[in-house]
């Protein structure tokens, strides 16, 4: 009883922080003519309510795709339609065709913020609570502390409740998928993940680990027996879920192709705005977007992404395990973020979710990563006038992690899960005994750099010739951190050893 009482308190704390952040500004507030993501979500409600399904993704006089045209999968459109019905009941002006463009009011802001909170309460928060309750080999207090830290992760809160999006829906479905598959409810887990992909196509960042883990399970059961039966069942679940979600768009071939064109807009280029990945960072020194043809950029990003995630995926197929699955989710999502085509700064949330799932296993490194992921979105958060909420939520999260996990005491090679790797290296370099000390120093350098860059960005004006100087520096520093983490997580995956300390797993 006490466990559920404390878990309820944790959820209430998470909800309080979320609602407090929601009282602040949002993307594009009072900034015509395009406004921002808040207006995009409102506009999708307008379009889905007033136009027939076959016109949702097509350009027309009633649906100007240049003005926040719908570019997410059908499940997002259905969610927008559901919200639109509620909006119509409260105030029809909020979704009136054409005349509602750029609509802003306190009442409408309250409505929009409430829709995010309800989605969070229905999908993401229950998944977090159940995940933490199912963790093995840790005390009840640690499970509750784990839930608190995950629910206080500032990146997701600031984007969903500040900037304004519904990332908790797709991430929540993905987490339900992780829960299902880790608990051997493979069909339910696959269904949940299919819903995640059909809500936001960026969930494809997680698709390969799901595929490889399930394929590994099938191989382990034997493809001539139970494994083959499981494979057929999984294929049926995936096909059926996609067919049901896409059914209204399968009536005509052009309908399906148009939706796909909207979901994967190759013509937008290698990257947009300032994002902390390889291509944006490297573009500072060599203008890749201007020098290389579009098709070469596509091939280059595909090959880089594929090669960077291949080792972890092969290992997961050959040795499927719950622990390996979670770490491969991190590695693959980070590879996609760093190397893939058309990445947005908010896509780092797709990496942050699986990092949250290993928070209790490697608290020091997970906390560090989650701090960097929030920092990497600083230019966007400043643009939305969310500096104060960013600072407060980041400090609250950091304090929660420090007090819950004593992260500064968890920096030994064993606690960092680098013991097997260090032993392997010491066979050739016996003096290699300082790895944990190096990581501690790197953490200090990283945190100091982030603090200094934040202060510089807020207090100093950039040179006139370099107006984006601080934004570029934030992205570059974040990218360096992410490259380090990519190496680190792949080391854990490739050097995973049974001789290491017992890992907390979901049964």
From Swiss-Prot:
Dolichyl pyrophosphate Man9GlcNAc2 alpha-1,3-glucosyltransferase that operates in the biosynthetic pathway of dolichol-linked oligosaccharides, the glycan precursors employed in protein asparagine (N)-glycosylation. The assembly of dolichol-linked oligosaccharides begins on the cytosolic side of the endoplasmic reticulum membrane and finishes in its lumen. The sequential addition of sugars to dolichol pyrophosphate produces dolichol-linked oligosaccharides containing fourteen sugars, including two GlcNAcs, nine mannoses and three glucoses. It catalyses: an alpha-D-Man-(1->2)-alpha-D-Man-(1->2)-alpha-D-Man-(1->3)-[alpha-D-Man-(1->2)-alpha-D-Man-(1->3)-[alpha-D-Man-(1->2)-alpha-D-Man-(1->6)]-alpha-D-Man-(1->6)]-beta-D-Man-(1->4)-beta-D-GlcNAc-(1->4)-alpha-D-GlcNAc-diphospho-di-trans,poly-cis-dolichol + a di-trans,poly-cis-dolichyl beta-D-glucosyl phosphate = an alpha-D-Glc-(1->3)-alpha-D-Man-(1->2)-alpha-D-Man-(1->2)-alpha-D-Man-(1->3)-[alpha-D-Man-(1->2)-alpha-D-Man-(1->3)-[alpha-D-Man-(1->2)-alpha-D-Man-(1->6)]-alpha-D-Man-(1->6)]-beta-D-Man-(1->4)-beta-D-GlcNAc-(1->4)-alpha-D-GlcNAc-diphospho-di-trans,poly-cis-dolichol + a di-trans,poly-cis-dolichyl phosphate + H(+). Residues 25-114, 165-172, 248-297, 345-361, 409-437, 494-507 are lumenal. The keyword Nuclease does not apply. Glycans are attached at residue 59. This is Dolichyl pyrophosphate Man9GlcNAc2 alpha-1,3-glucosyltransferase. Residues 1-3, 136-143, 194-226, 319-323, 383-387, 459-472 are cytoplasmic. GO terms for molecular function: dolichyl pyrophosphate Man9GlcNAc2 alpha-1,3-glucosyltransferase activity; dolichyl-phosphate-glucose-glycolipid alpha-glucosyltransferase activity; glucosyltransferase activity. GO terms for cellular component: endoplasmic reticulum membrane; lumenal side of endoplasmic reticulum membrane; membrane. It is linked to Congenital disorder of glycosylation 1C: A form of congenital disorder of glycosylation, a multisystem disorder caused by a defect in glycoprotein biosynthesis and characterized by under-glycosylated serum glycoproteins. Congenital disorders of glycosylation result in a wide variety of clinical features, such as defects in the nervous system development, psychomotor retardation, dysmorphic features, hypotonia, coagulation disorders, and immunodeficiency. GO terms for biological process: dolichol-linked oligosaccharide biosynthetic process; protein N-linked glycosylation. Keywords: Congenital disorder of glycosylation, Disease variant, Endoplasmic reticulum, Glycoprotein, Glycosyltransferase, Membrane, Transferase, Transmembrane, Transmembrane helix. It holds the Pfam family Alg6_Alg8. Its main location: endoplasmic reticulum. Belongs to the ALG6/ALG8 glucosyltransferase family. The gene is ALG6. It is an enzyme of class 2 (transferase). The chain crosses the membrane at residues 4-24, 115-135, 144-164, 173-193, 227-247, 298-318, 324-344, 362-382, 388-408, 438-458, 473-493. It is found in: Endoplasmic reticulum membrane. The lineage of its organism: Eukaryota, Metazoa, Chordata, Craniata, Vertebrata. Signal peptide: none annotated. It comes from Homo sapiens (Human). Its EC number is 2.4.1.267.
